[in-house]
Design a protein with these regions (language model features):
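Conserved SAM-binding loop
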Residues: 263-264
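Core catalytic lobe of class I
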Residues: 1-253, 257-260
Length: 274
């Protein structure tokens, strides 16, 4: 089998086949089922805790072995289980880099007996403890204020010299809280599908920009794998970037034909515009 683009099938079997073919990837960016009884067309989100953790461990072990030596995993989760998943990553021999937070901006709550849910965590682990990709300048954000320009701040550099702080022309460094709205409301009607946990393209594109390797000329050119491709957001984002001159190879594996069809339809619309 050729592993390139959208593939409809069981990620457990297909990840093993990728290993048999000696395929390796630079980045694994995935949003697997959270085991919250969502309807994905099968029982993958309705498991006992033990079964959920066992399946998660198997997938993470396979993913680790598919990573290049300087590769990274970005794994979305939910606050219920993210601690378990983080422990599984440690046990697999992966190296913790950061727990990032996707801050919804437009969260919701189904109960009056708990705080409003406004975030989902996503873990970043690297295969190596010495080398990984993080494109800091590609994901800078606007400064919140200009107070530092009005009231200059001085600091001592590595030589002990007093230096005036100057703003980076590209913006402030991104923190570990990533603020992007969910796909709610009319403004997102063209992007939104029926998939119950679809992530916004704006968020996934920003993550790709942060963690995908680049060529000497500044183009993204790594190989990205999503073993739980869902409605196809990763593929759509990669193809939109490729239409700008980047050369990202992506592999999206999805079990359910319904979501494969949705992903294919979204991709077809993008590719006809290229």
């Amino acid at each position: 089998m050729k592993f390139d683009g959208l593939i409809c099938g069981d990620s457990d079997l297909l990840l093993k086949e990728m290993l048999d073919q000696n395929i390796s990837v630079d980045l694994i960016l995935t949003d697997p089922p959270y085991n919250l009884n969502k309807d994905f067309g099968n029982d993958s989100d309705k498991l006992s805790l033990d079964d959920f953790l066992l399946i998660t461990k198997k997938r993470i072990d396979l993913c680790k072995n598919l990573l290049k030596d300087d590769g990274s995993i970005i794994w979305f989760g939910i606050h219920h289980y993210i601690g378990f998943i983080q422990s599984i990553m440690y046990e697999a021999g992966l190296n913790y880099r950061r727990m990032n937070i996707w801050y919804y901006e437009n969260g919701f709550c189904r109960t009056q007996k708990a705080p409003l849910t406004q975030y989902e965590p996503f873990l970043w682990f690297s295969k190596s403890n010495k080398k990984w990709t993080y494109n800091v300048d590609d994901v800078r954000i606007p400064y919140k204020s200009t107070d530092r320009l009005k009231n200059p701040i001085y600091y001592k550099n590595s030589k002990g010299e007093k230096v005036k702080w100057e703003p980076n022309p590209l913006g402030a460094m991104r923190g570990d809280v990533w603020a992007f709205p969910t796909l709610a409301g009319k403004v997102f009607k063209d992007e939104r599908t029926e998939h119950p946990t679809q992530k916004p393209e704006s968020l996934i594109t920003e993550i790709i920009k942060a963690y995908c390797p680049k060529s000497d000329k500044g183009f993204y050119e790594g190989t990205i794998l999503d073993p739980f491709h869902g409605s196809g957001t990763l593929g759509v984002c990669c193809e939109k970037l490729n239409s700008q001159g980047h050369k990202i190879k992506w592999i999206g594996i999805e079990l359910e034909k319904k979501w494969c069809d949705v992903a294919k339809d979204r991709l077809d619309k993008i590719l006809t515009l290229v």
